């Protein structure tokens, strides 16, 4: 990917901002166990903010603001920034950084673990994401009652490529199929290790995630439950995934729940596990997916499978 155009961003990054960033990234001892790798390149930071296309009326959620190198740029464009930060030291430095400036009234800092924090309404999410919460963060955003219009997220390069992978790609996995059902994902830029302090061990990428509107009319837990089974070994046949004793026990339990909800009695003389196996075989045969591999299947294949299972009372959550 081409390097950021310095002329494009030079007007948005002041000498004062650059000096503040250099100071803050030089005095802190960062906790890499918390994924603290501060983005120090002002051109990359400005490029990320510009890609969010922030409106003056927008509320922006920032996850892991650190010392505020992205935050101060977001504050210039947004109505309000809600920053979720786990490290009290970082929160204190960010507070000091905006103290006495017009941006101070526009910043709200929520101190705590993002995954355990109840989020307020927001229009956009921007994050230099701590890599250990990459997947949980994506699914928390997707499952918001009112999901953001757009999310601009920095991830470990391989994780970003998994989000973008298509059927047949080596990196195509449950994450790929799951996220792409609910959102459109595009790659924005690569970010090298030397753009961070301290440098991480891996390269990074920035992606844009836009939640589909309207949302697909399927239950998230049902969809996710099916994918968890078929992607256990993505290069094995789909039928192989349904032969696991654990899977059969889960489906049997769910089937009993389905019957109870629909006021249908269980035939005590019938071997329920044999019935479940028979239903699975029938569905896989009729859909023509028994011998296909999950790593080669697309959304249409999985939707066909999910619908067929539901038709015979087999559920995944």
From Swiss-Prot:
Molecular function as annotated in GO: 18S rRNA (adenine(1779)-N(6)/adenine(1780)-N(6))-dimethyltransferase activity; RNA binding
Enzyme Commission number(s): 2.1.1.183
One GO CC term, this protein: nucleolus
PANTHER family: DIMETHYLADENOSINE TRANSFERASE, DIMETHYLADENOSINE TRANSFERASE-RELATED
Catalysed reaction, written as an equation: adenosine(1779)/adenosine(1780) in 18S rRNA + 4 S-adenosyl-L-methionine = N(6)-dimethyladenosine(1779)/N(6)-dimethyladenosine(1780) in 18S rRNA + 4 S-adenosyl-L-homocysteine + 4 H(+)
Similarity comment: Belongs to the class I-like SAM-binding methyltransferase superfamily. rRNA adenine N(6)-methyltransferase family.
Protein name, as recorded: Dimethyladenosine transferase
Gene Ontology biological process: maturation of SSU-rRNA from tricistronic rRNA transcript (SSU-rRNA, 5.8S rRNA, LSU-rRNA)
Pfam families associated with the record: RrnaAD
Top-rank EC class of the record's enzyme: transferase
Gene that encodes it: DIM1
UniProt cross-references to SMART domains, sorted A to Z: rADc
KW Methyltransferase (keyword) present: yes
PROSITE patterns named among the record's database cross-references: RRNA_A_DIMETH, SAM_RNA_A_N6_MT
